[in-house]
Amino acid sequence: MTRRARAIGYGIGWAGLITGAEWLARRPPRGRSQAWLLAYGVLGGLALFSGARLAPRSRGLSLPGLVLATIGYPLGRRLLSDRGFARPPQNLALELAALEVVAVTEELTWGAIVEPELGPAATAALFAAKHVVIDGRWRRGLGLFAFWMGLAAQRRRWPVAAMLVHAALNGAGVVQGHVSGRDRF
């Protein structure tokens, strides 16, 4: 087996593990935020145990990447007419805590493990597909793909900044969802 085939298998294996862990954790009776804390807490630990680290590169910020990460998700949702009508299912503090754990873990798993093996575009496609499968909302896919591609551009320059932006955008989405009464996740 070639190194490339092994790398692809490793990346796809992690994508399957992430999807399966979240799917299992969301089984009743847990709420969404508790499921995220459980699944992503375990996945983050596994990623660290596997050696995942955010590379210490510091070549500054990628303005195009940050813009795409920031506007990609809402623009993609708008283009495909995705409108979350449900109220956020849990309280603000619990959702903020859960989505910050999710952001850090997604950077350690998708960003530090899957993306180096599969590349940014394939990882963005799998990242978006995972969300569509788990959430059952296909109209989020384009926005999530664009969001990940923006983070990938930043990650190439400074992975820690990508993680901080990911966490900040998740946090802003939680607050916006609670203020508007429309869940963004």
Pin down the residues of each PLM region.
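Alpha-helical transmembrane segments of multipass membrane proteins
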Residues: 13-22, 43, 68-73, 77, ...
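Transmembrane helix-loop-helix hairpins at the membrane interface
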Residues: 77-82, 88-185
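Short, aromatic- and cysteine-enriched interfacial helices/patches
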Residues: 63, 67-71, 184
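Residue-level signature of transmembrane alpha-helical entry/exit and packing/kink sites
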Residues: 3-11, 36-37, 58-66, 91-95, ...
